[in-house]
Design a protein with these regions (language model features):
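An amphipathic alpha-helix adjacent to DNA-recognition modules
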Residues: 3-6, 13-39, 49
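Cytosolic nucleotide-binding catalytic cores of signal-transduction proteins
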Residues: 4, 99, 106, 124, ...
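A short secondary-structure junction motif
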Residues: 26-33, 58, 62, 84-93, ...
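Secondary-structure edge/capping motif, primarily at the C-terminal ends of alpha-helices
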Residues: 38, 62-66, 93-96, 122-126, ...
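Amphipathic alpha-helical packing segments from all-alpha helical-bundle domains
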Residues: 50, 71-96, 102-117, 147
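C-terminal peripheral helix-coil segments that are non-catalytic and often amphipathic
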Residues: 113, 121-149
Length: 149
């Protein structure tokens, strides 16, 4: 990395602890940019569609990280990124403003776990199914189940 970017090691380690820290920073920056470019969130699905499209575009990079010797670190920082994304969504979504703090925390935890579970399943399947229709179906099932009760 330092050779390719024409940096010395001290400069790199001044900004980042290690390569997983750099990867987490990169993915968070990438997610923030997607969120900012798609600011108007109506539902969790409208938040996730741009992220899903980006995951599909960067499938090989995600698979490489997931299948690497640093799989545990990758999953850990994806948990951090998913939590970050869900919290950003919650802060910007008017649908959740009136919820109690406990309800917000529960919803944040639920959506984070849902995102990570879907991502890990997709990576385990080597990305051989299209994430977008799969996630759309999940949210449709969630909505219709909630409306039925």
């Amino acid at each position: 990395i330092v050779e390719r970017c024409h940096l010395n090691r001290n400069t790199f380690y001044y900004h980042f602890q290690d390569i997983p820290n750099l990867a987490e920073y990169t993915v968070k920056s990438w997610a923030d940019q997607i969120i900012q470019n798609n600011y108007e969130f109506g539902s969790p699905m409208t938040c996730l569609v741009p992220l899903i499209e980006e995951c599909n575009q960067h499938k090989k990079a995600f698979q490489h990280l997931y299948n690497s010797s640093q799989k545990d670190e990758f999953i850990t920082y994806m948990n951090h990124v998913a939590l970050h994304i869900v919290k950003m969504f919650m802060k910007q979504s008017s649908h959740y403003v009136l919820r109690s703090e406990q309800e917000k925390e529960t919803l944040i935890h639920f959506y984070k776990c849902l995102m990570i579970g879907i991502l890990i399943d997709w990576l385990e399947a080597q990305g051989d199914y299209d994430l977008k229709p799969f996630v759309e179906q999940i949210f449709h099932l969630i909505e219709t189940t909630i409306q039925a009760h």
